[in-house]
Amino acid sequence: MLSRLFRMHGLFVASHPWEVIVGTVTLTICMMSMNMFTGNNKICGWNYECPKFEEDVLSSDIIILTITRCIAILYIYFQFQNLRQLGSKYILGIAGLFTIFSSFVFSTVVIHFLDKELTGLNEALPFFLLLIDLSRASALAKFALSSNSQDEVRENIARGMAILGPTFTLDALVECLVIGVGTMSGVRQLEIMCCFGCMSVLANYFVFMTFFPACVSLVLELSRESREGRPIWQLSHFARVLEEEENKPNPVTQRVKMIMSLGLVLVHAHSRWIADPSPQNSTAEQAKVSLGLDEDVSKRIEPSVSLWQFYLSKMISMDIEQVITLSLAFLLAVKYIFFEQAETESTLSLKNPITSPVVTSKKAQDNCCRREPLLVRRNQKLSSVEEDPGANQERKVEVIKPLVVEAETTSRATFVLGASVASPPSALGTQEPGIELPIEPRPNEECLQILENAEKGAKFLSDAEIIQLVNAKHIPAYKLETLMETHERGVSIRRQLLSTKLAEPSSLQYLPYRDYNYSLVMGACCENVIGYMPIPVGVAGPLCLDGKEYQVPMATTEGCLVASTNRGCRAISLGGGASSRVLADGMTRGPVVRLPRACDSAEVKTWLETPEGFAVIKEAFDSTSRFARLQKLHVTMAGRNLYIRFQSRTGDAMGMNMISKGTEKALLKLQEFFPDMQILAVSGNYCTDKKPAAINWIEGRGKTVVCEAVIPAKVVREVLKTTTEAMVDVNINKNLVGSAMAGSIGGYNAHAANIVTAIYIACGQDAAQNVGSSNCITLMEASGPTNEDLYISCTMPSIEIGTVGGGTNLLPQQACLQMLGVQGACKDNPGENARQLARIVCGTVMAGELSLMAALAAGHLVRSHMVHNRSKINLQDLQGTCTKKAA
């Protein structure tokens, strides 16, 4: 219950940082204003002469007080150093400075508001600083800085408050009760300092629970700049910080604190309310006199300066001990800000929070040279799941993004370089806390019993025992994900199995697999998974198409492709944009059936081409889906074989599975009318899918799209760096005549497949369908009053594309679809998102055609690729497998 309340409080504070900060500052100013203008009008030293108590001030007391102040400042300095180890010393340092300053101001205002004097603040200041515990800020900041986005910052702050809030509250209560005992001592100085201490603890608690989380959330929100796909403030060594913070406080310690609190409450109650009140009254009278509240002792004087000048003079008047203290504070602040950057710049600086991948690779290789061989370490890993944590940390490979190990399973897919194959399972966080596994693998019979036990399962088995069961054929290797408690552990074990069978056991070292949502992959996208392949994603645009602008994501490893397409998009935009139309929409499936004789096949063909036969088949076909609607049948014969090409709309799905289901149902219905018909295959390559085919070029498949644009002569000259005449000439002789001479089918273009494939990979399409989807004819001609403008059109008859199903279910691919505004199914007009995506593909292809044809016409192609598309890595430094074998 308490954790839930603190979580709600943390979420509110992190979600409304401006409101909380402004509210805190406003409350502080209001309390100060009420004291200054509407509070007690008796101000000691300005308009009222307070009693002076003669006290002997020894030089030793001044020295002790100065030493105490210096110790307090050093304590704060070391607290900031520990806080800096979280990552950015600037972000957290500023937040910590805000916390200390606001705590001090709030304590001062509380003291003013309660009408207490400030004469004891000089002595109480060191104790105030010593009571500040920045480990609280450190713990909460760990939660915030382990986030991938601003929304996750809020969630993690709320989660941190739920875990740390009850502990903070209990600690503050115990501190107040313990320090409050000093207020009953009867010693004036001790009572004043203890009173300050209690107020400081309460002020710190208030600020840490409100001002600090709001400040951290606001600072991270304002630091929106990203680097390598992650927030600039996100640091790599926060990979397992949430797992560390999940450890609950020691329950024994918590019980002791609660018992202590109860005892102290009884002590306070007995001393203040139950004991004989007469001593209390005398003490109160003494306190009243000591604080200058007895009007018989005090007397009013005429102020010589204004009130603000009085306060200013008190602030700037300093003794020698105060000068020493401030000098030490200034020197430590300068050292902290300016002279401690070098030691943390490589890993903790905001400018470069993560080491370069190339440097990391070299460091990993160097470290490997100093350790035992990889195979030996792997064997050690298979025989033990509990190894030295230091050794585990030594074998880590630098990640691209921080890995957040969360207690709750989320559907977030983030890209993290996987640990090397030598990383033990304990480093993966796969074993639950409290489960102790044996060092040596147990017998197969015992392991099978544990695996089949509903209360235990695979989490009570080590990786070595799982591998042992796989090798003994008790567990199929392809079922590892379904049998393990997490999909990721199944992938990890499969990698371990595979690495022992490879010629180079460390081959999988840089193939990432960690922190990926495999639940979206299993049974939908891939089998026998050993990881995922990060591919760079660039953006071309804005593409001005049909009056709208699109930023087009392109996943590719070919240099110059995105840059070239981007130039084409710019030329189209400067020319007023492009226009597009979807001419046809229908996915196809072409099964093959066989009849006893060719004449029987001809009879079936004739029946299918009649309205009655088509209506029967359409009814059976349409009954299989609420989206699939049979449009037409294209039937042809080859001897006694009959090829039937079904064409149907499939909504926003690419539709191969949908139309296959309808085709199968229609064939069964057809078999009822012609019992001698034999169904050979639901796909007879008459579709045609993933193969060059004239039928797709002629009849179309998927979406048939045409796109056009007019590029002004000025844009052709200044952006494309060529002339309209040259581009038209090259297009005719290259794209038309050249492709015809090569016998191309649908390849009357410069490089449509480049753009299609890049968009397909980014948007979760079937990359193999670029074969048919890249069918395109690019036409160019001179236009305009002077025939100097360039008219260009691209016609693509077979774009096989969809926005639901398959790879579009993966979150990174969904992100790219969301960039284009076509993610998921269109509720208002089913199929519109897929058609719009096909238009974008065609428009982007036209942009790519423009730029490449201009480069060819101007003779810039080879030059640009020699400059921008050549790797700068020195291959002589990289020894391949063949080199090692030869050596």
UniProtKB/Swiss-Prot annotation:
The keyword Magnesium does not apply. Disruption phenotype: Homozygous knockout mice show early embryonic lethality. Pathway: Metabolic intermediate biosynthesis; (R)-mevalonate biosynthesis; (R)-mevalonate from acetyl-CoA: step 3/3. Residues 1-9, 79-89, 150-159, 221-248, 340-887 are cytoplasmic. Its main location: endoplasmic reticulum. It is an enzyme of class 1 (oxidoreductase). The active site is at 558 (charge relay system), 690 (charge relay system), 766 (charge relay system), 865 (proton donor). Residues 61-218 form the SSD domain. GO terms for molecular function: coenzyme A binding; GTPase regulator activity; hydroxymethylglutaryl-CoA reductase (NADPH) activity; NADPH binding. Its EC number is 1.1.1.34. There is a cross-link at residues 89, 248 (Glycyl lysine isopeptide (Lys-Gly) (interchain with G-Cter in ubiquitin)). GO terms for biological process: cholesterol biosynthetic process; coenzyme A metabolic process; isoprenoid biosynthetic process; long-term synaptic potentiation; negative regulation of amyloid-beta clearance; negative regulation of protein catabolic process; negative regulation of protein secretion; regulation of ERK1 and ERK2 cascade. The modification Phosphoserine is found at residue 871. Residues 40-56, 115-123, 188-191, 276-314 are lumenal. Regulated by a negative feedback mechanism through sterols and non-sterol metabolites derived from mevalonate. Phosphorylation at Ser-871 down-regulates the catalytic activity. Glycans are attached at residue 281. It is found in: Endoplasmic reticulum membrane; Peroxisome membrane. Keywords: Cholesterol biosynthesis, Cholesterol metabolism, Endoplasmic reticulum, Glycoprotein, Isopeptide bond, Lipid biosynthesis, Lipid metabolism, Membrane, NADP, Oxidoreductase, Peroxisome, Phosphoprotein, Steroid biosynthesis, Steroid metabolism, Sterol biosynthesis, Sterol metabolism, Transmembrane, Transmembrane helix, Ubl conjugation. Belongs to the HMG-CoA reductase family. PANTHER family: 3-HYDROXY-3-METHYLGLUTARYL-COENZYME A REDUCTASE. Homotetramer. Homodimer. Interacts (via its SSD) with INSIG1; the interaction, accelerated by sterols, leads to the recruitment of HMGCR to AMFR/gp78 for its ubiquitination by the sterol-mediated ERAD pathway. Interacts with UBIAD1. Catalyzes the conversion of (3S)-hydroxy-3-methylglutaryl-CoA (HMG-CoA) to mevalonic acid, the rate-limiting step in the synthesis of cholesterol and other isoprenoids, thus plays a critical role in cellular cholesterol homeostasis. This is 3-hydroxy-3-methylglutaryl-coenzyme A reductase. It comes from Mus musculus (Mouse). The lineage of its organism: Eukaryota, Metazoa, Chordata, Craniata, Vertebrata.
